[in-house]
Amino acid sequence: MTLFSLQIEIKKGVERILEKNVRTAESRIKRRNYSRISGSLKLPNLVEIQTDSFKWFQEKGIREVFEDIYPITNFNDTLSLEFVDCRFDEPKYDADESKERDAIYAAPLRATLRLVNKKTGEIKTSEVFMGDFPLMTDSGTFVVNGAERVIVSQLVRSPGVYYASEKDKTGKDLFKATVIPNRGAWLEYEMDSNDVVYVRIDKNRKIPITTFIRALGTGTDEEIAEMFDNDERLSQTIIQKDSTKNTEDALIDVYKKLRPGEPPTVESSLTHLNNLFFDAKRYDLCRFGRYKYNKKLGIASRLAGHELTRPVADEATGEILFDAGVTLTFDQAMQIQDAGIKEAYIKAETKEYFVTESGENEIRFIEKEAKVIGNGMVDIAKYVDFDCEALGISEKVRYAVLREILDSASSEDELRTAIRKRADELVPKHIILDDIYATISFFLNLCDGIGNVDDIDHLGNRRIRSVGELLQNQFRIGFTRMERVIRERMNLQAQDNDVLTPQALVNIRPVTSAIKEFFGSSPLSQFMDQNNPLAELTHKRRLSALGPGGLSRDRAGMEVRDVHPSHYGRMCPIETPEGPNIGLISSLCVYAKIDDLGFIETPYRKVENSMVDMNNDDIVYLSAEEEEGKIIGQGNAPLNDDGSFIRDKVKCRQDADYPVVPPSEVELMDVSPQQIASIAASLIPFLEHDDAHRALMGSNMMRQAVPLIRSEAPIVGTGIEKQVCEDSRT
């Protein structure tokens, strides 16, 4: 026997002994659970942030883009290319074969398009190949040129209306407002120390706000005074800065500021303002933007807790809902809002700043009547008996349009048809005049001590753009480029009297190049970290505030990187990189989910009459905004078998405070103490005894561990190891 063969035999013998020892050791070891808490909620699927989002894109997102872009008409409006349907074919290779061949795991996308000649009435329908579209594997990755890539979810500021304040050198509060759409022109309001209010349109030069109000159609001084109840700040703006006297003057003045150097006319100014704000193709709120606008600009949030100075009557019936002198609860304020009432008068306390004879600044509070204007949106469920989601209505609707529909419809079928037909009017995708007037009213109300400024770092004001939405945005860019090409071809071929077909008009190159560009060069499209199963899983659950439309690491301040109370159970306070990206890249917590608007939710058990509901089917998922003000018990609070609290005082959390309250005041309870941490941090045994800096390093270094050839169970574990391995699907 040669030395080499002897070495091989010895090696095999050692392996057999080791294998036998491992088997006998594993059969002897019994897992002991030292946890004091039983009945913790089972972890959700840990890669669903990726898979669910891509599934939404395939089923709904891609169709939304087609419906937004089509129909495409030529300049004479004689030809129209309409969208009928779209589908994915089977992929040429499966994911494994794509890796072997260094190919893209993709499926052909086909769209059925209809070309209508309005002159002749001729209609041609055919299926058009729209390019190969990359598909997501079951494990939440894409295979591009044989390599697995992950699209990292992006954490961005949500579209909405945000108010802030700063103090001038005399200590006076100066307010600012920013109206942010998902896509389109920004509106920014600001005031100076002389109580003059300005507006910036699309980050251009500032304009007196009364000039802007006139340009929108409220032309004379009397109309402005009537609409905003003789507000002294608007009066000061008119006296000191506004030289215009009617709508025509204001339109020309606005156009000069927005388009300096171009000849100003009333028509061109009207067209420009209409394109900036009231064209759904240029100004897009999306569902989440409309939700945030309605939440902020509804009349209820400003009326609650204030005393009415005039009676409030239902416009439709004339019935007095509430008399003057009533201090409104939130439910009563919601009743006023859902009755379609856009304005009400309440008692307010405004600050007035004086300089005393000794030269000191003095503040006096003066009681006054303030007018509150809302945006006229109501809950449609209060007016119809059927579910409107199937009709395309999932948000609050414009009361004026709903009233028209209700008055004209004579049967339920007619009502359903009218609601479906006018869904875009009921829930506008762009900003409307009522929204703009409500934003100005809120700004003036803040000066009178009504309403609150916003915390921009609160997770209720930040949302997740996950893979489906990022792909949809890229797809829309490609389609917008393609739309121009189609329109030009329509005109050329119509002039040459060529035989037109949908295939001849469509050029797919802009769409395919936009998608390739995204997967190849976007900072959010990254090679998957494949050191070990944990590295793969955390990469798919990563949240980045960087990337297009996000922050830049050079300009991001301390506040945006810091841990915020609203991160609890949503974003891990521990796992983040060291170095320039600290706080800008983070990880989802173990139980966190993303709702259909893109806001992060975390689960809680309900607590009613001091009894915790231990049924896992009755868990409630709340976003950071919904959780505000709630008193939430800790997940390790000791309970009796019937779900009642053992102790007569319970440690709780309420926003940024940690009160100790009797059980009767507790509203919700954490589902598990692990809820606060990410997957990597949850794998650290006895995490609560670790120093935070060491835990941060540990959770990052676990991703760099070299995996064993033959995997072993950990001697000390936290109980989630099995699911981490299963969900990483390696």
Regions found by a protein language model. Give the residues of each.
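Active-site proximal loops enriched in glycine and acidic residues that flank catalytic Cys/His/Asp
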Residues: 575, 586-589
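Edge strands and adjacent loops of beta-rich recognition modules
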Residues: 701-722
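Short beta-alpha junctions and helix-cap segments that line functional grooves
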Residues: 97, 130, 137-139, 559-560, ...
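Hydrophobic beta-strand positions
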Residues: 312, 573-574
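N-terminal non-catalytic structural scaffold regions of very large proteins
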Residues: 2-541, 589-708
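Flexible, glycine/threonine-enriched loop-and-boundary segments that flank and lead into catalytic domains
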Residues: 124, 542-573, 715-729
